[in-house]
Amino acid sequence: MKKFHKCFLLVMILTVTGIITACKDSNEGVSGSGNQNLSLLTGGTGGTYYPLGGQIGKIISDKTKANITPQTSGASAENMETLRVGEAEIAFSQTDIAAYALEGKEMFDGKPIDNIQAISSLYPETVQVVTTAKSGIKSIEDLKGKKVSVGAPGSGAYINAMQILEIHGLSEKDIKGQNLSFDESAEGIQAGNIDAAFITAGTPTGAVEALSVQNDIIILPIAEDKIQALVKKYPYYAEDTIPSGTYKIKSEVKTVAVKAMLVVKKDLDEDLVYEMTKAVYDNTDQITHAKGEFITAETALEGLGDMEVHPGAAKYFKEKGVSK
C-alpha cells in the first residue's frame, strides 16, 4: 500500500510539474517574459536584406530575450504573406509593398493584411535598371524588345519595374520579361541570357557588385520629368542618386528609391518590441553593412505614410523625441 502511495505521489508531482512547465511555456509565447525564438524574414543572398538582417538579428539576440533567426526569402511581398499566416514574426519589406499589403492593393488586391505594423524605416532602396556596355542599351526606352528580368511575380522589384515601364510608355508586353532573383539576374546578364534587370535594393547590391568584376556596368538613368511623374502617381518613391564609383560607374546616375523597413506582427509583445527597437537603434555602431549609416532614430519614422507603428517601437521613438 505504501508503495502504491509513493508511486501515486510521484505521478502527481510529475503531472503538476508538467502542467506548470506547459503554462510557463505558453505564457512566455504570449507575454514575452522569457526567451523567444523569432524568425526574421529577409530576402535573397544576393540582395541587401539578408546580410543586413544577419547583423540586426545578432544585435537583437545579444541584447534582448529574443533569439532571432534570419531566413532567406523571396523578399517583400512573400514576407508580407508569411506574416499574414503567422509563420514568422518580423520581416524586411519595401515601404510601398507594406502599404499595398495593408491597403489590399496591387499584388494584394482585395486581400489586405491587417495583422502587421511598422517598427521603422531603415534606408533607401534604390531602383537599379542594370545592364552592361556591350548590350547597347542606354535608356529605359531601349528595353523594348529586350530580354529583361523584372523580379519574381508580385515582388517589390516586379511592381517597381511595371510602374517605371508604365511611366516610360511601355508595358510588360513590350519586353521579353523573365522572373529572376537578383543573383539569377546577374548570372543571366553574365551568361548573355538576358540583356538587363530591374533590381530594387540598397546600394551597393551584392549581385551587381559580383557582376561588375568582369563587366562594365551601366545603370540606366531616369529623366527628371519621368521621376516627377512617377512620384506624383506613386508617392512612396523619392528621387535618388547612385554615386560615381559604385560598381565602377564613371558618372552619377539619377534614379528613384523607396525605403526599406522592418515590419512586425501587431500581436507581438509590446515590451519585447520596445527592447528590440532599443537594441537596434542604441547599437547602430555595430552595423557594419554599408547601409548602416542610414539607420538612425532621427529618420526611423520617415517614409512610413499612414502605416501604424507598433506600440513598443512607438514608445522607444517617443523617448527619443521622434514622431511621424
Language model: regions and residue ranges:
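Ligand-binding clefts/hinges and TM-proximal coupling segments of bilobed small-molecule sensing domains
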Residues: 146-163, 234-306
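C-terminal motif of bacterial Sec signal peptides marking the signal peptidase cleavage site
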Residues: 18-22
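An extracytoplasmic/periplasmic, membrane-proximal ligand-sensing/linker region
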Residues: 180, 184, 190-191, 201-203, ...
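Pocket-lining segment of extracytoplasmic ligand-binding domains
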Residues: 95-97, 105-107, 114, 135, ...
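N-terminal segment of the mature folded domain
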Residues: 84-118
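Bacterial signal peptide processing site
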Residues: 24-26
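Bilobed "Venus flytrap"/periplasmic-binding protein-like clamshell domains
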Residues: 35-68, 125-191, 307-312
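Bacterial N-terminal signal peptides that target proteins for export
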Residues: 1-9
